[in-house]
Amino acid sequence: YKRCHKKGGHCFPKEKICTPPSSDFGKMDCRWKWKCCKKGSVN
């Protein structure tokens, strides 16, 4: 979040990013991350 502001970007609501498990027995690894855009971005 702060890192995004240092670059002069705009921060948006968090987005859930999921990565498949390394094994068939594992669950999906999901974590919330800030969705950031560069300064001057339309979204």
Curated annotation (Swiss-Prot):
Primary site of residence: secreted
Disulphide-bonded residues: C4-C36, C11-C30, C18-C37
Xref: InterPro entries: Myo_ane_neurotoxin_sf (IPR023355), Myotoxin (IPR000881)
GO molecular function: potassium channel regulator activity; toxin activity
Location(s) in or outside the cell: Secreted
Similarity annotation: Belongs to the crotamine-myotoxin family.
Subunit structure: Monomer.
Listed name of the protein: Myotoxin-2
Organism: Crotalus concolor (Midget faded rattlesnake)
Lineage: Eukaryota, Metazoa, Chordata, Craniata, Vertebrata
